[in-house]
Design a protein with these regions (language model features):
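Feature captures the FAD/FMN-dependent oxidoreductase FAD-binding
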Residues: 71-144
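Solvent-exposed beta-strand sheet faces enriched in polar/charged residues
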Residues: 35, 99-101, 206
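Short, flexible, glycine/charge-rich loop motifs used to bind or transfer phosphoryl groups or to couple energy/partner
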Residues: 22-23, 52, 95, 106-107, ...
Length: 226
């Protein structure tokens, strides 16, 4: 059978939850369903668990305008952001609108009936569920959750150590007393380096092009005063 909703949202991360909350506030009579492939709220902030994961933007502008960020830290850690998203979803009741374990496989607009036709696989049953909706919001982000970018390096098969991608950080990875090389100097690398130095014997960063790094306070005195 085909399930119809006024609005279908793909993804229960910060964008999907934010969109659902806005709809709940502004259009309370509209039916909403969130299709989430994974089994947890939070998207990126639930998936990524590497040491020191935090926001790259200040939370006062990154957070929701209808539920302002109230913690003192401007650049919040991943656990705090995940908790913030989950608490917001619960407070506005949109957590009850989420259908976990649904992988959207097709989404097609039909001009004949002016509806979106969406197919999603239920990973618990293996069955493909059919949905129609007046509006479809894609809030799945830009990461490939199955396979983050992973270049192959010549000679890596001869390397006797462990190669780790931050997107798939092993829960019990033990790097204490080991020499670590971090390839790249983007936001993830800048976060990883200082958070690995306490345990690792030595941490080196390799970068292709020089960059500028500016240390900013974790707590903004102006925001704190306000």
């Amino acid at each position: 059978s085909v399930q119809h909703q006024d609005v279908l949202i793909i993804g229960a991360g910060i964008s999907g939850i934010g969109a659902a909350c806005h709809l709940k506030r502004e259009c309370p009579n509209k039916s909403i369903v969130i299709l989430e492939r994974r089994h947890a709220v939070g998207g990126t902030w639930d998936l990524f668990r590497y040491p020191g994961i935090r926001s790259d933007s200040d939370m006062y502008t990154f957070g929701f305008n209808f539920k302002p960020w109230t913690e003192a830290r401007v650049l919040a850690d991943g656990d705090s952001i995940r908790g913030y998203v989950r608490k917001t979803a619960e407070e506005y009741g949109v957590d009850q609108k989420i259908r976990f374990g649904r992988k959207v496989v097709t989404a097609n607009w039909s001009s004949a009936d002016n509806l979106w036709h969406v197919a999603a696989v239920n990973d618990a049953t293996g069955e493909t569920e059919q949905y129609t909706a007046n509006f479809l919001l894609g809030c799945s982000g830009y990461y490939n959750y199955d396979a983050g970018f992973r270049p192959e390096f010549p000679g890596e098969a001869d390397f006797q150590g462990q190669i780790v991608h931050p997107q798939f950080w092993p829960e019990n990875l033990d790097y204490a007393g080991k020499k670590v090389v971090i390839i790249g100097s983007g936001a993830t690398a800048i976060t990883l380096v200082p958070n690995m130095t306490d345990k690792a014997a030595h941490v080196s960063m390799l970068q292709r092009s020089p960059t500028y790094t500016l240390s900013v306070p974790a707590i903004d005195p102006v925001s704190k005063a306000l």
